[in-house]
């Protein structure tokens, strides 16, 4: 067992930061059910773009992105439409940990057709590089069917 996974139980067991990071990194699920549901809708949308529409990184356009409201409705989370960024951040963390392009790059504001303000602070995401991240997402064949 790696040394940093060993800890003593002195009354109250407190996991070290390294143990928490290890567990989070190798977790197969999202931190919240909401993030998992959103991620699964984004995975469905990714498959739709690649399989049904036969899009490539060169042919995808902003009109193919999934507006936050539609994303939340499809996940039966309509009440999150205005605050969905927090959960999309968890999706970004999962993608970053799994070393795949950010699925959350496919989710956009309906009016502007670009991601919301929180996109820039999400793991592995940069608003300045957003379109390249979308293209990498569309090209990726490593995503699971479901999370």
Language model segments and positions:
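Intrinsically disordered, charged low-complexity linkers and terminal tails
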Residues: 1-14, 83-84, 98-100
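Basic, amphipathic alpha-helix used for nucleic-acid engagement in HTH/winged-helix/SANT-Myb modules
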Residues: 4-31
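Nucleic acid-binding interface residues in structured DNA/RNA-binding domains
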Residues: 23-48, 60-147
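Short acidic/glycine-rich loop or secondary-structure boundary segments that cap or lie
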Residues: 51
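Intrinsically disordered, low-complexity domain-flanking/linker segments in eukaryotic proteins
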Residues: 54-58
């Amino acid at each position: 067992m790696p040394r940093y996974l060993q800890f003593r139980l002195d009354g109250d067991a407190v996991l070290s930061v390294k143990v928490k990071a290890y567990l989070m990194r190798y977790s197969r699920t999202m931190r919240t059910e909401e993030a998992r549901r959103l991620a699964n809708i984004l995975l469905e949308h990714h498959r739709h773009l690649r399989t049904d529409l036969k899009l490539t990184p060169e042919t995808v356009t902003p009109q193919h992105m999934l507006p936050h409201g539609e994303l939340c409705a499809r996940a039966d989370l309509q009440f999150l439409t205005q605050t969905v960024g927090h959960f999309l951040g968890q999706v970004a963390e999962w993608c970053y940990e799994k070393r795949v392009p950010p699925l959350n790059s496919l989710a956009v504001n309906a009016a502007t057709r670009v991601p919301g303000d929180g996109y820039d602070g999400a793991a592995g995401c940069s608003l300045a590089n957003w379109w390249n991240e979308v293209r990498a997402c569309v090209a990726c064949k490593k995503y699971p069917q479901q999370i």
